[in-house]
């Protein structure tokens, strides 16, 4: 059955958060919860929030965040969230969402796009079919927002 990938609207965010289940943070590291943060990202030029829908039902979604990188020689896009309804067509929907994220990243001048390594082997295969390759993980240090420091 046919579905459409389009830019998300703020009215889509609750459905996207519900579809995400426990994959989103609880908001404990910042003042905004996941839904509030995604609503802001809808309007920011350095982010792309997408949804896949069929007959007004959200089948999946993706968030692409863009940051500058001197090392990469331009901007780097990060697909920060990719969720699909397992009852739908997860392979086709995720492929369409990733493809649209890559198109958006190219249009915004990104030199590369990265994503977190999935734990699920089937999900890993989906990413590799889209041209993603294994890369060395990054070092990370959590920083408490200024209002939450003790």
Language-model segment annotations:
Residues 114-124, 142:
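Conserved beta-strand-loop-alpha-helix junction that forms the acyl-donor binding cleft
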